[in-house]
Regions:
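Extracytoplasmic "Venus flytrap"/periplasmic binding protein-like
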Residues: 68, 72-136, 167-179, 278, ...
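Mature extracytoplasmic/periplasmic domains
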Residues: 45, 61, 292-296, 314, ...
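C-terminal capping/gating helix-and-loop segments adjacent to ligand/active sites or protein-protein/ligand interfaces
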Residues: 2-13, 62, 145, 358-363, ...
Length: 434
């Protein structure tokens, strides 16, 4: 007996049939994109995907990301390749140029001006600019999303701090580390041991400061942050040019005083052992360095009692700190860019997943929620709190910038150039990079 359906009934039956067919196709994996996350995520689970990931981090530290991501994306496997940090950039760039680069890469915080053309930004569907601002500190926003396009997410945020030898401080009856540069200057004579004669050889140093990269690890970063504390912008906001003026001159003079044998604050020489070695061996009471160096220092001297304090400030009411860190980005040539960004956002924007990484890596946090949680942590608290006031500036080539600043310092210490001449030479060389 034929069915006599009205026009409205036919429309309803057709709609029901269409919905049922659509759900069947989704279930079979023919139509990806709308599955529940616990059955493979919005990318589906039918297609097997392998994401290649290159970086400098220890594979064991990254395992929480891989394990947690596979729980929601069982069809995706992440293959990680660890590369020595000294070789990483060259190896990565050569591979990308040859079309053999990874889908996901570790990307340094100051790389964007140099390597922006090699990575693909996230889409609005993956993470919005406003969400990025909510999640991460200002320094990451300025480094990774300068024009509201998000090129990378920070894995951690390390900052330059004051690392001191607790035993030496106790022996000199110094109960607390300096809070500002004035306090630091006053402490210098208490730790100094200077030899007799006109050469004034440094036997024991208060801190590794005033030298070039030849003897001081992160010397360029230390001079950079002192310039920023003195009010330097380091680069013009309109013309993107370096213009060293009064703030930079004052900061440079301040820095160099600690390596001037004729000065009252003389405490360092480029002829001394490298700062990390000098600190590990007790030849200097303090260094200005990052959390990343602490395991190395303890390896050099397992009995070293390291105190961690905030970087001294010119104006403690308006602290300015300096960051050095890595993020994760997706290669411009990746065939799995959507999956790559899905992995990055899930791993780094999720508090529970990011915290598991911190627990094994001991890296300072990048998420604001974790910065708040770790603010009073005995190991990471100083680094976490400084991340909120960390600054940076767009460097066209971080390696060349580092060398230019080091040469500038050394040229004055060796009396090859005056301070003004050295600044002018460095200014010209920096502007040639843009």
């Amino acid at each position: 007996m034929p069915l006599n359906l009205s026009r409205n009934q036919i429309i309803i039956v057709s709609a029901i049939f269409g919905v049922v067919l659509f759900l069947v196709l989704v279930f079979l994996g023919v139509i990806p994109g709308l599955k529940e996350q616990n059955s493979g995520g919005f990318f589906g689970q039918g297609e097997q995907i392998v994401l290649s990931f290159w970086g400098v981090e220890n594979n064991d530290f990254l395992m929480p990301f891989f394990e947690n991501y596979q729980k929601i994306r069982p069809n995706v496997r992440v293959d990680y390749k660890q590369i020595n940090e000294n070789d990483y950039e060259k190896t990565l760039i050569n591979a990308l140029a040859a079309g053999r680069g990874p889908d996901i890469m570790m990307f340094r915080g100051n790389w964007l001006p140099k390597h922006a053309d090699k990575i693909i930004p996230a889409s609005e569907n993956q993470i919005t600019f406003s969400r990025f601002q909510e999640l991460f500190p200002t320094v990451a926003v300025s480094d990774f999303a300068p024009e509201r396009k998000i090129y990378a997410l920070p894995l951690f945020v390390d900052t330059l701090t004051f690392l001191y030898n607790k035993n030496i401080f106790d022996a000199k009856s110094v109960a607390l580390p300096p809070k500002n540069w004035n306090d630091f200057q006053n402490l210098v004579p208490r730790f100094n041991e200077i030899g007799p004669g006109p050469n004034r050889q440094v036997i024991k140093s208060a801190a590794a400061i005033g030298g070039s990269e030849k003897s001081v690890h992160a010397a360029g970063d230390l001079l950079n942050v002192i310039m920023l504390q003195f009010g330097s912008q380091l680069i013009g906001q309109k013309n993107r040019q370096i213009n060293f003026g009064e703030p930079e001159e004052k900061a440079f003079d301040f820095y160099l005083q600690f390596a001037n044998p004729a000065g009252q604050r003389y405490t360092w020489s480029d002829n001394l052992p490298y700062s990390l070695n000098a600190f590990a061996e007790g030849q200097t009471a303090a260094i200005f360095d990052y959390a990343a160096q602490i395991p190395l220092l303890k390896k050099k001297n397992p009995f070293l009692e390291i105190g961690v304090s905030f970087l001294p400030q010119l104006n403690p009411e308006k602290p300015v700190n300096f960051a050095d860190y890595w993020g994760l980005a997706v290669s411009e040539g990746s065939k799995n860019a959507a999956y790559g960004w899905d992995f990055i956002v899930y791993s780094l924007a999720d508090q529970k997943t990011a915290e598991k990484y911190l627990e094994v890596s001991k890296r300072p946090p990048a998420l604001r929620t974790l910065i708040q949680k770790f603010a009073n942590d005995p190991d990471l608290g100083v680094f976490a709190r400084q991340a909120l006031t960390a600054r940076s500036w767009p460097q066209p080539d971080n390696n060349k910038v580092k060398q230019i600043f080091s040469n500038m310092i050394e040229s004055v210490l060796t009396a090859k150039l005056s301070r003004r001449e050295a600044l002018q030479k460095a200014e010209n060389e920096l502007n040639e990079l843009y």
